Amino acid sequence: MKKIYHNPTGVKKYTGLIFISPFIVGFLLFTLYPFVSSFLLGMTDYNGISPPEFTGFSNYISMFEDEKFRNSLFVTFRYSVILVPLKLVISLIMALILNLEIRGMGLYRTIFYIPSILGSNLAVVIMWQFLFTGDGLVNQFLEFIGIGAVNWYGNENGSLSIIVFLRLWEFGSAMIIFLNALREIPPEYYDAAKVDGCGKMCAFFSITLPMLKDVIFLNLILQLISAMQEFNAPYMITGGGPMKSTYTIGMLIYDEMFKYHNSGYANAVSWVLFVITTVFVLLLFRFTGSHREGNQ
């Protein structure tokens, strides 16, 4: 009886493709297609109902003549410049504290990470609004120490401060990244520095910071991207006011898309935001790259 041998080579050839096909399909449907569609819609006059009408770069030209766009761009830049450095500093300080070998430190790490999980959901927003009302806990504390109550929602700086405070409260993600990096620093470095007479501050600036350079850069990029896309907090807490002082680009995109049904313009603004954020990230890469070459 003649034996039949099956050659598995043909099957093995397509096995890998079969396993990665769900990822490829998902990428094409949920990443590449929306990406290309958004770019094309940004060059049309489209209200979401009638067929889009190609207008070329008219949306981009009118964008830079739009006072709302210029204001939202300024607010987003101002917000990012204030928030990102503060969040990095607070996250690093908390990571240094939580890196200490103290009993129950695991519980403290969990507690400080919880705000990042909660984010800016409705319950957190209500709590935040209660804290900063005219007779809220924050103003009561300020009156107690003799500073006096502040009209947080009635002035531009106060409203932006509320948004910044809310996002600073969510320092847990950056803190965890710093904490993991701190635990990777060999303790022998600190022992050698101590033998050489280097104190804690000396060890921090000569060992800890240089060893955290890449992680600081990573957190800087992540926090910058997040800040440039800000929408939830100002939308739910201040509504962009007062006087559009918290009206970010994210809110402008939302209003143009769902309030004014100007989908073409909204997609164009989103692409400008994408390009600006990408340029900032590339500049940071260039700066850190040249800095490393200089150190070498």
What are these regions (language model features)?
Residues 4, 8-296:
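A structural signal for multi-pass alpha-helical bundles of membrane permease subunits
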